[in-house]
């Protein structure tokens, strides 16, 4: 019966192949909240090593994209970035082949916080999206905070659930099929990214997805904290708080008649600044 339920998860929830990307770029994935200056300075320095070092900001996730973009431009310039541009695009603009030229000379791209679905409504499957993937393959640094962290993975948490809870009672159960996902940018295909993780108590939704997609790691990044994913598929934790990793690869998963998820044997890691993790072996690096 347990094997039948495992097959059910694969068929019903579209398990994604965890093939390694082989990209030469870096991911700088921030869990939201305040951004420590030393952490962000590292992003600026990394972006300066590729192309002509220009940083492109895409703030379309924000409800106030112009103001958000201007703020990020000022932040990066204050940290030493020489060339920073913010572009607020519509879906129509992103569908234009000319949109990809906005990324000429880019060494780093930064995706703002806000609503990740709003960002993806503009970018998904456009010439600009394809160019972003090409640049990542070539060595560019892709960074984002909060919603901009969520868009990094191929399977993206939207922040919604299928049941209709009362306000203040969101994500209170581990229930099969409850967590809504959609397609992200796909820079990382071996894990699902969640953000504001410990601060906003988001364990329930990520554990649910790990149960449903057991070949994908669940990586929950807290505020003021980031992971830097290198081309060798390892990541380092930087910042002031924690990163939680759930590994359900060898877990025993089942679902009750009332659709509650049971997950036995899941591995959990709680990582802090300086810790490193191998996405291939699913183990910490000592």
For the regions a protein language model found, what residue spans apply to each?
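ATP/NTP phosphate-donor binding region
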Residues: 44, 53-102
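Catalytic nucleophile loop
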Residues: 112-113, 136-156
